[in-house]
From Swiss-Prot:
The keyword Iron-sulfur does not apply. The keyword Cytoplasm applies. This is Pole-localizer protein TmaR. It is found in: Cytoplasm. GO terms for cellular component: cytosol.
Length: 111
């Protein structure tokens, strides 16, 4: 009867890891969308900067645009780093799930 407890705990751990892996996949997709959105904003600000002419109180407007562009570029960099971290964790969980599956298959064949 006690042999069922570790097996049940193994199943719970497997489910927990599988759910975490799926959550990471959703987060990765969300971060990729944010990267694309912010890259589009950077491009928009580049284009907007091209249209502003000196007669339009350029210094103040270009200063604001430069600041906004820098903020968006920083966000893109932050999202790229976050995405890499999430991908790494997802790969580690995939390896653990595969190892658990192989271990269970090995035990089933031995019986």
């Amino acid at each position: 009867m006690e042999t069922n407890k570790p097996s049940f705990q193994d199943v719970l751990e497997f489910v927990r890891l599988f759910r975490r892996k799926n959550k990471l996949q959703r987060e990765i997709q969300d971060v990729e969308k944010k990267i694309r959105d912010n890259q589009k904003r950077v491009l928009l600000l580049d284009n907007l900067s091209d249209y502003i002419k000196p007669g339009m109180s350029v210094e103040a407007i270009q200063g604001i645009i430069a600041s906004m562009k820098g903020d968006y570029e920083d966000r893109v960099d932050d999202y790229i780093i976050k995405n890499a971290e999430l991908s790494k964790e997802r790969r580690e969980i995939s390896k653990k799930l595969k190892a658990i599956g192989e271990l269970k298959n090995g035990e089933a064949k031995a019986e």
